[in-house]
Amino acid sequence: MVAEHLTIRNLTSTPITLKRIERFHAPEKPRDVDIGALAKNFTRLVTNVTRAEAPVASITDDTKPFQHKDVDIHVEPFKTVRTELRSYIDSDKERIRWFFESKGERHQIQTPVPTTETASMKPLSKDAKLRFTGIFTPAESHLAIFSSANLNAWMRELKDDTLLSSLSIPGTHNSPTCHVAPPSVRCQAVSPREQLKNGVRFFDIRVQPKFPNDKDKDELALVHSTFPISLTGDKYFRDLEREVIDFLEHNPSETLIISLKREGPGTHTDEQLSRIIRDHYARPGSRWYTDPKIPTLGEARGKIVLVRRFNILEELKEIHGGRGWGINATGWADNCANATCPSGQIIIQDFYEVMETQNINKKIQYVTNHCKRASETCYPFGILPGPKATKAHPFYINFLSASNFFKLGTWPEKIAEKVNPATVDYLCRKHGEKEGADWSTGILVTDWVGLDGDWDLARAIVGFNAKLMVRQVKQDNNERK
């Protein structure tokens, strides 16, 4: 059932006016067989991917609408307007081309979008400065409009005094598990490098020390629980770190939070892992940020921010003036809907035991509840002195991932198939209600993001930094007066 009327939500800092809509009948004849699409479907079979959506035909510029209507529907920043425009005239398969105006510029989008690329609105004005992205929810006839960000370097739009925990950040769960592997082990559709290019700024990494007793060895195998992440042989953290550093060198405005946890078979300890990271990775002068306080963007740009889910050597507790080493995420509550790490710097939702498919709705509710908690924050700008000060301004880390290794319907990609679209829908239609808050999403940690080029979830998360940026501009203007 499709909602009766069209709804527009403006999640940008710019007033937007709908000026015209054009309606088009759905294509009458099926598309020609696409050999590329068939190949892609075959690839899904051999890489454990089960979600597949047929592409929608594009409306060409010379296609004539069967109906059009000139309107003047104004939508203020961060407001929603439920219009009197009907969702469809003859069939709920109809297409719509929308024409918007903002600051004298005209922009166009068609819905449903034919490809992921056309989620970006098409500027119709010469030398247009504004860029918009639209995410359409067909069942609700709802169009959410975001300011388009260059996902490759979206943090450069934010000022140095922005606290990292105040940001809306896309993340991935078991980030490097994109290789051919058992379906209960694989969690990602694309490589870490591709994730970084598309806005992901939080990696969840699990490692196994291969030679824990040899101080000269730095090998850390990438694992998921007790399993290697690839059937073709061990993959190593050193190679992943090189990719991250290369990305940061080319995008110095960005930072990456890495949550690191020890897993895998063998006799090794957290303390041994902490020594390996200190001696071989996070050395003085390296790109690692190991201060135990939550940094501002200015402190973290170009760096890897360590969030450690492991205990450390006693000598590391004396670093940074006796304040410790790395943002402390030890004491991470298991399988929780809402819990705070003992350090006070991280509040988590990490309910993962979805034993039956009907429990997926419970997981979705936990995700949206944690989003709401994050949305009600309003953190200060500027550098905070230490871990105790940052307790009042924690990270909200929200895992969309869950699985049951022993049940086909609850393998990671099956969970993501339902949780990811539900989260996009929630963000676009419902997230952000409290006045005076920043509407942050916190860090949303996902499985299978970017499948078939679908980055709507990352776009929506990054887009929710707009309200924070507006508050920052207002504060700067007030300080100048």
Residues covered by each model-derived region:
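Long, acidic (Asp/Glu-rich), low-complexity accessory segments flanking structured domains
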Residues: 2-198, 211-250, 312-314, 403-481
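A generic structural motif
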Residues: 258, 284-299, 399-400, 446, ...
